[in-house]
């Protein structure tokens, strides 16, 4: 009776998954319980129409876009819809002061005008396969955790490599699930010729910018259009003017029926990572170390960038993409830490862990193996706490901070003898970073971050440059930075050219920027070595915790954490109550765009071109108007998504495209750790008018 009560209490604390709309499900492993729940909510498609490794199915219309976003194929000639913020870096690369596609938008009026993007690819999933037995077959009982990891990694590489050996157009990737308790093979086909077809002005595609990011109500037209190209046999090919539009296996039909409150909807895409099974010790470390470091350091860096971007168009274009990426994670970290505190996530996790402790105590088999599980986890997180915190600030300050250091590290890692395709891509990356760099801004950033890092960490973790600054430059960080940039050849086109042309008279290791890069890598290595022992035990402990949770809740319908593999989430269109006395509707209209512009007259985040405002003010929306004569812009649902889902197709019950998922809401920013059914919402861009 006591055990039954414990389980009832624990289930109320830990919902994986207690809600019909929670979960990021593997399409190739949808069980009966999940399919039943989807049908009860309104799904009208059989499972083999969602995922079928032998016949075209809905999953064949969904792509991983560049490995960082998702997309959906919507035409027989390879058109792909994704989010504007997913295509933002591509638009930026093609922009200049003379052709400001970021500000004005871009449209290719013919296929000849479509713009190539060598850095981009789209990835189609062909099939998945459970390879757990084969991977874990390489593990021996006598192995310690490091030996186990090495054996597992080797077998994962072997299994993945077998796919390409059989067919060079395919890629096999084995991923770990449930903390390394299961392993699945995904077989992909990549297409590397992806061209920009259309992008709205940023005043539409980024309307609200940082102010509205992660916020509902939302009025952002966050979409871009690209096209996939292939060779004349419809096979993957690198960019060539001779390539032709790709003809996909499956094209997502676009809904003409719209939606209403309570309508079934599902996203299919590539969510990046979640930590739903992470221990309270891991959550606390994330909050206090990596998240706080991002908040502190990026806040300093971005303030400098933003000031200069607002003052000069050429700087705005150069820095737009990197500012956008940096600020997105910066605000995310702020929101996650806020949610952890406000929603009591740590307290909920600790209560759940207390119930697991009791369950372990009452089960002899579990007690023998796991009696010290939480004690060991707590001890090992404590043992690496200070080094982990310093490393988080170190990475943000120096590896993600001054771009001169980033250039030096890329040059240090460059391999002229590598595969030609890899060499060319790396060269382009170096040249592109250099072309988007303003040295005066970078010097100011470096100086500011040297000061900020010193304030945030113990003196034990100060790299050698601080001794140099103290001894040689009288403690003046700016003087040190000025001297570094003046004496390094990497800050000049001539120096970069000498490296790229492999000039034998250029002694690269004598360059002070390269020397600094080596010092930074050395310190990073030292930090990793200091944390190696506790980190190894933490990996083991979190894996064991993941396993015991699933054994304890045997009747629960579990899903694995997101890991950048294809997932499906489902739910219904619905609003929510963010706080007492307030209710948010489930959709927004163009009326809200006009209201926000009027309310933020001097705010660049809400600046919109007069011609766009004129179109919206006219009210001539044709067939896209609803029964009130309004045109809807965005809607929300209780689907379960995370980063990487940006650009994910939002389908209705028939598998027809409603729009694209592009964001989550501020009140549920802790959703990567704990799903909050009353608060968590997916923000979607609408492609068609609701009925």
Task: Locate the predicted segments by residue.
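Bacterial Sec-dependent N-terminal signal peptides
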Residues: 1-22
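N-terminal leader/propeptide and maturation segments of large enzyme subunits in energy/redox metabolism
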Residues: 29-40, 109-177, 289-419, 438-442, ...
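A conserved glycine-rich beta-strand in the N-terminal activation segment of trypsin-fold
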Residues: 60-77, 182, 251
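Catalytic nucleophile loop of clan PA
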Residues: 71-73, 250-264, 641-661
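Active-site-proximal beta-strands of protease catalytic cores
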Residues: 79-86, 261-273, 652-667
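Catalytic-histidine neighborhood of serine endopeptidases
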Residues: 81-126, 664-665
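Long, charge-dense accessory insertions within large macromolecular proteins
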Residues: 148-227, 506-632
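Conserved small/polar residues in nucleotide/adenosyl-binding loops
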Residues: 687-691
């Amino acid at each position: 009776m006591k055990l039954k009560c414990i389980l009832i209490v624990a289930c109320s604390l830990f919902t994986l998954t207690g809600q019909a709309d929670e979960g990021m499900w593997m399409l190739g492993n949808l069980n009966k319980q999940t399919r039943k729940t989807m049908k009860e909510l309104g799904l009208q498609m059989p499972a083999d129409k969602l995922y079928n490794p032998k016949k075209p199915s809905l999953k064949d219309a969904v792509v991983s876009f560049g490995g960082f976003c998702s997309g959906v194929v919507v035409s027989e000639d390879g058109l792909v819809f994704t989010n504007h913020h997913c295509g933002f870096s591509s638009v930026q690369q093609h922009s200049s002061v003379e052709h400001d596609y970021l500000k004005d938008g871009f449209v290719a009026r013919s296929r000849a005008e479509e713009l190539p993007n060598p850095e981009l690819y789209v990835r189609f999933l062909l099939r998945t396969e459970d390879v757990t037995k084969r991977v874990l077959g390489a593990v021996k009982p006598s192995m310690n955790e490091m030996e186990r990891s090495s054996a597992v990694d080797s077998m994962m590489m072997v299994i993945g490599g077998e796919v390409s050996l059989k067919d060079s157009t395919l890629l096999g990737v084995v991923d770990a699930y449930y903390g390394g308790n299961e392993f699945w093979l995904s077989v992909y086909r990549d297409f590397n010729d992806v061209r920009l077809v259309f992008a709205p002005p940023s005043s539409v595609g980024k309307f609200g910018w940082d102010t509205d990011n992660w916020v509902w109500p939302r009025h952002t037209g966050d979409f871009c259009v690209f096209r996939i190209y292939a060779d004349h046999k419809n096979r993957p090919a690198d960019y060539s003017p001779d390539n032709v539009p790709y003809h996909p296996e499956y094209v997502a039909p676009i809904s003409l029926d719209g939606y209403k409150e309570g309508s079934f909807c599902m996203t299919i895409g590539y969510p990046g990572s979640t930590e739903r099974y992470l221990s309270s010790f891991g959550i606390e470390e994330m909050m206090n170390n990596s998240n706080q470091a991002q908040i502190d350091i990026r806040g300093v860096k971005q303030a400098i960038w933003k000031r200069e971007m607002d003052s000069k168009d050429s700087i705005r274009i150069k820095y737009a993409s990197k500012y956008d990426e940096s600020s997105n994670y910066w605000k995310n970290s702020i929101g996650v830490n806020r949610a952890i505190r406000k929603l009591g996530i740590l307290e909920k996790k600790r209560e759940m862990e207390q119930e697991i402790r009791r369950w372990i105590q009452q089960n002899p088999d579990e007690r023998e193996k796991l009696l010290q599980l939480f004690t060991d986890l707590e001890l090992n997180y404590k043992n690496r706490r200070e080094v982990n915190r310093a490393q988080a600030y170190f990475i943000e300050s120096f590896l993600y901070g001054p771009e001169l250091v980033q250039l030096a590290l890329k040059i240090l890692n460059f391999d002229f003898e590598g595969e030609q395709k890899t060499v060319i891509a790396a060269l382009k990356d170096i040249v592109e970073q250099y072309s988007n760099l303003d040295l005066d801004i970078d010097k100011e950033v470096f100086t500011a971050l040297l000061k900020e890092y010193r304030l945030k960490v113990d003196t034990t973790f100060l790299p050698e440059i601080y001794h140099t600054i103290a001894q040689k430059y009288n403690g003046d960080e700016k003087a040190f930075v000025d001297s570094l940039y003046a004496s390094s050849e990497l800050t000049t086109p001539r120096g970069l050219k000498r490296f790229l042309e492999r000039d034998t008279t250029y002694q690269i290791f004598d360059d002070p920027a390269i020397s600094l890069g080596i010092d930074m890598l050395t310190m990073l290595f030292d930090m990793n070595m200091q944390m190696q022992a506790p980190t190894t035990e933490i990996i083991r402990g979190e894996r064991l915790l993941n396993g015991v949770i699933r054994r304890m809740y045997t009747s629960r319908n579990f899903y694995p954490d997101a890991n950048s593999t294809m997932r499906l989430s489902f739910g219904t269109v619905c609003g929510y109550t963010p706080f007492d006395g307030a209710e948010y509707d489930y959709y927004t209209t163009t009326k809200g765009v006009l209201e926000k512009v009027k309310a933020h007259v001097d705010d660049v985040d809400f600046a919109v071109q007069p011609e766009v405002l004129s179109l919206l003010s006219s009210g001539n929306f044709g067939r896209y108007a609803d029964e009130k004569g309004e045109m809807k812009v965005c809607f929300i649902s209780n689907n379960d998504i995370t980063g990487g889902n940006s650009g994910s197709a939002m389908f209705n019950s028939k598998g027809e495209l409603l729009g694209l998922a592009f964001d989550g809401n501020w009140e549920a920013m802790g959703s990567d750790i704990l799903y909050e059914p009353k608060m968590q919402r997916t923000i979607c861009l609408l492609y068609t008018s609701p009925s």
